[in-house]
Amino acid sequence: MSLDLALDIQHATTCDWLPTDEQFALWATTAIGNSMDEAELTIRIVDSRESQMLNSTYRGKDKPTNVLSFPFEAPPEIELPLLGDLVICAAVVENEAREQQKTLEAHWAHMVVHGCLHLLGYDHIEDEEAEEMESLETQLIEGLGFTDPYKEQ
């Protein structure tokens, strides 16, 4: 079974380097895996200002963040392949990659995988949940050819 992914990528940033649409599709498809037969996903790449506004509005944190996940929640009687939206702040991803001594590509891949797992219901609030999510993220990221995103540099 392979995933039929309808991916909408929105560029709302002036960042110098962004992954290709093909990279975004590969990373999202890898994260979603066999969880769904088909999925519709929007990835919106934003600047710090938009990220800060959304983070403040939806999480009560008045600062930009790397990735926000907005799962689509349909009524139980309606079956739609809408997975949800990811909003990724290019400037935060770039800064974190530099601080963590990772390549931009590796950190972008991690943010897409991380965000997609949130859309699938994974979380990292409780220690046990965090352990499960981080383990799956590491497995997926390493499967894409990158190093463990949680390994100390």
Curated annotation (Swiss-Prot):
Cofactor: record remark: Binds 1 zinc ion.
Alphabetical list of InterPro entries matching this protein: MetalPrtase_cat_dom_sf_prd, YbeY, YbeY_CS
Enzyme Commission no: 3.1.-.-
Alphabetically ordered keywords of this record: Cytoplasm, Endonuclease, Hydrolase, Metal-binding, Nuclease, Ribosome biogenesis, rRNA processing, Zinc
Principal subcellular localization: cytoplasm
Residues the entry annotates as binding Zn(2+): 114, 118, 124
Molecular function as annotated in GO: metalloendopeptidase activity; RNA endonuclease activity; zinc ion binding
Subcellular location: Cytoplasm
Single GO biological process annotation from the record: rRNA processing
Cofactor(s) this protein requires: Zn(2+)
GO cellular component terms given for this protein: cytoplasm
Top-rank EC class of the record's enzyme: hydrolase
PROSITE patterns listed in its UniProt record: UPF0054
Any Pfam family hit: YbeY
Free-text function comment from the UniProt entry: Single strand-specific metallo-endoribonuclease involved in late-stage 70S ribosome quality control and in maturation of the 3' terminus of the 16S rRNA.
Protein name, UniProt field: Endoribonuclease YbeY
Source organism per UniProt: Shewanella baltica (strain OS223)
Species classification: Bacteria, Pseudomonadati, Pseudomonadota, Gammaproteobacteria, Alteromonadales
